[in-house]
Amino acid sequence: DICERFSEALTCFGYPECKGGIMLRNAAWRGTVSEWSTRVRDWLLQPEGDSLMHLAIFLDAHAVAGDAALLAEVRQRLLQLATDSDPLIARFAMAVDAFGSPAGWWNRLLGLGEEGPVNLKKAGIFPIVHGVRSLALARRVMATGTAERISALVADGTLDAGLGQELLQGLHFLMGLRLQAGLAELALKREVTGNVDPARLSSLERDLLKDALSAVKRFKAVLHHRLRLDVV
């Protein structure tokens, strides 16, 4: 059917199949407005397994063809449901702390902790992206991109302009550094992890990495305060 052909076309274009099955060919990711409304409601109110991850993916979705109003309707229902409950948003946002405290990454950069590579996605990229996503959900921001969400959150006073700029610059730096590391691993025919060994970075790169992780640390403090994560 068309869903199968669409997925096959993506493969031909060079997009690998999603290991998690988040694809059009998967019936769990298709449905009517009513079906989707029930699905996202269950993800939010009765989270189990990968429910919150699926909810995060849905919040980043945007229409590329067809009637965009259908997606907008489901998203509006979700925003209405979520913003009526602070505990629900706090539970969703708690994932920013899933990979340990920033202190661990700082110790590695300063040579005070265990040696070894730093997982940039866990240390900085995910906390920025998901933290901004969570604040956007709390403030009913309809934008789906992190940069657009930061801009909207700064505009409505939710996020300090200086911190917003630092987060955006830090995100771009971390993503670039991770891409560079991944390409280097690929060139050496190693498994691509995108992890970075601080000892192999230049002095400038180490300083920029420290700045980025410092912004992440301060952003997490903002999230804990605004979304009351410490009382969940």
Language model: regions and residue ranges:
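A nucleotide- and high-energy phosphate-metabolite-utilizing enzyme signature
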Residues: 1-232
